Curated annotation (Swiss-Prot):
The lineage of its organism: Bacteria, Pseudomonadati, Thermodesulfobacteriota, Desulfuromonadia, Geobacterales. It is an enzyme of class 3 (hydrolase). The gene is lpxC. It comes from Geotalea uraniireducens (strain Rf4) (Geobacter uraniireducens). One of its GO terms (cellular component) is membrane. Its EC number is 3.5.1.108. This is UDP-3-O-acyl-N-acetylglucosamine deacetylase. Transmembrane segments: none annotated.
Length: 307
């Protein structure tokens, strides 16, 4: 689509917070063109609005947290990935607590709800950040590189010193249907010993086998097992899409990540946005005889080769 989109109708989600263990409700509402994704902490006095942008990230410990004026919202990455994958550029997110509900540990419930709410085109062009030169950021043996590409593609190489995970690699060319079917159901995961330690420090109070894949020394603890044989790396790609969505534009490039997490994802997007010599910001304007919803093959943009 050449034009920005928003929700056609409101949609609400309720569930427990992964870390607080408290019941939380959030409501997505339509927003005007150029608004972006804005969270509203409606439980604070006065309410605080926080734009879902890279510059508002205040923590990347365990999840991605945005904050402003003393208020914060954590664990936003699954919702951000769902909004991005459904083509929603603008939305108000009313939330009555400090974190997005974890739901089943994946982005699938959000994708389903957003799809049911529907979307509509707005009168403003969507912006695309088209990578022209490679950009790399490293932290020890962790690394993220983005290369020029006609597509938005993510390749992820993950390593864990555990026989259940070991090394997993997957690459995906971003496509809404592929994300919905093959990546959005992938759940967050954790090692039981680490989860118990977090609980002892007042974190992960809402974690359970209902919203995460549990791993112990012997293997997968969940009775139902995994949703995909490589569910772990699929979830890492899901998280990355959500974190990268905080750039506020649609990325056109091939991201290659190795052992990265929320912290490096944030550093990467911050670095990329600062390197304006390595990309071009483009808008698509449809021909005058086309409607606002005319189809265009994006991010598979053959015209990029001429840029």
């Amino acid at each position: 689509m050449a034009f920005q989109q928003t929700l056609k109708n409101k949609v609400a989600f309720s569930g427990i917070g992964l870390h607080s263990g408290k019941e939380i409700t959030l409501t997505l509402r339509p927003a005007d063109a150029g608004n972006g994704i804005v969270f509203h902490r409606i439980d604070t006095t006065p309410p605080v609005s926080i734009e879902a942008r890279t510059e508002n990230v205040v923590s990347t410990r365990l999840s991605t947290t945005i904050g402003k004026n003393g208020a914060a919202v954590s664990t936003i990455e699954h919702l951000m990935a769902a909004l991005f994958s459904c083509g929603i550029d603008n939305a108000h997110v009313d939330i009555n607590g400090p974190e997005v509900p974890i739901m089943d540990g994946s982005a699938a419930p959000f994708v389903e709800g957003i799809r049911n709410a529907g979307s509509k085109s707005l009168s403003k062009s969507r912006k695309y950040l088209v990578v022209k030169k490679p950009v790399t950021i490293r932290d020890g043996d962790k690394r993220i590189t983005v290369l020029p590409s006609r597509y938005y593609r993510i390749s992820f190489d993950m390593h864990f010193n555990h026989p259940v995970i070991n090394r997993q690699f997957r690459t995906m060319k971003f496509d809404r249907e592929s994300f919905a079917d093959d990546f959005s159901p992938a759940r967050t995961f954790g090692f039981l010993a680490e989860i118990e330690a977090l609980m002892a420090h007042g974190l992960a109070l809402g974690a359970s086998l209902e919203n995460a894949v549990g791993i112990d020394d012997n293997g997968i603890v969940n009775p139902e097992g995994l949703r995909f044989t490589d569910e772990f790396v699929r979830h890492k790609i899901l998280d990355s899409i959500g974190d990268f969505a905080l750039a506020g534009v649609h990325l056109v490039g091939h991201v290659k990540a190795c052992k990265s997490g929320h912290e490096l994802n944030h550093k990467f997007i911050t670095e990329l946005l600062s390197r304006s010599d390595c990309w071009s910001l483009m808008e698509l304007t449809p021909p005058e005889n086309k409607t606002a919803s005319f189809p265009i093959s994006l991010p598979e943009m053959a015209w990029l080769e001429a840029c």
